[in-house]
């Protein structure tokens, strides 16, 4: 056997080269994708609109629509989101908006939560309080999400009632000096409907 035969035998008997692992693709990991799906499911379960999902969940619109259909059995409703701050300062919704915003501030200051997680937790707290009092809900999840956005952007703020000392949602340009809430000084037509949430829950 000559040198060439020995070399050929060595090459033929050598193990096959191990293929190199492919570098991970840039972008989200599988775990991040699963987390976003869980977040979307949680929000859809609370009644979030498609526009809200698109703002908070980093999944393609097509996937969000498909997920919504799978969970709800229908296509997402169309239409614009609430865009006016006036609704939140009207008499009956104001107590509920104030309750929700109080829960949100608690979650961000003492619950170490922020962003959409703080909104989700505060909305659950709001609904739990309503179950305890038997009061009908005035805020959908989309309304609650919009309220928080208005508050964070400085379009709405909280003012303390001089009588009950509770904090209530007011327009950003409303005077807070000697403010009296709608529960302590209800409008004349207020007696024709059901009473809003107790003042103790609004602060």
Curated annotation (Swiss-Prot):
Co-factor binding details: Binds 1 zinc ion per subunit.
GO cellular component, as recorded: cytoplasm
Protein's UniProt keywords contain Iron: no
Cofactors (names): Zn(2+)
Provenance organism: Cupriavidus necator (strain ATCC 17699 / DSM 428 / KCTC 22496 / NCIMB 10442 / H16 / Stanier 337) (Ralstonia eutropha)
Main subcellular localisation: cytoplasm
NCBIfam families in the record: PRK12722.1
The family this protein is said to belong to: Belongs to the FlhC family.
Molecular function terms from GO: DNA binding; zinc ion binding
Protein name per the record: Flagellar transcriptional regulator FlhC
Keywords per UniProt: Activator, Bacterial flagellum biogenesis, Cytoplasm, DNA-binding, Metal-binding, Transcription, Transcription regulation, Zinc
């Amino acid at each position: 056997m000559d040198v060439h035969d020995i070399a050929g035998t060595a090459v033929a008997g050598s193990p096959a080269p191990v293929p190199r692992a492919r570098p991970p693709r840039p972008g989200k990991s599988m775990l991040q994708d699963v987390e976003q799906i869980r977040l979307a499911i949680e929000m859809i379960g609370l009644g979030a609109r498609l526009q809200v999902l698109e703002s908070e969940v980093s999944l393609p619109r097509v996937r969000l629509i498909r997920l919504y259909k799978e969970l709800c059995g229908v296509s997402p409703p169309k239409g614009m989101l609430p865009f006016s701050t006036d609704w939140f300062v009207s008499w009956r919704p104001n107590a509920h908006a104030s309750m929700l915003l109080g829960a949100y501030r608690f979650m961000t200051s003492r619950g170490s939560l922020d962003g959409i997680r703080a909104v989700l937790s505060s909305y659950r707290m709001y609904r739990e309080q309503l179950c305890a009092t038997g009061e009908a809900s005035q805020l959908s999840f989309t309304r609650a999400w919009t309220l928080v956005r208005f508050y964070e952007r400085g379009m709405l703020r909280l003012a303390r009632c001089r009588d009950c000392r509770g904090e209530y949602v007011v327009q950003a340009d409303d005077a807070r000096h000697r403010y009296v809430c709608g529960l302590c000084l209800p409008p004349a037509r207020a007696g024709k409907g059901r009473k809003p949430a107790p003042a103790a829950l609004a602060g």
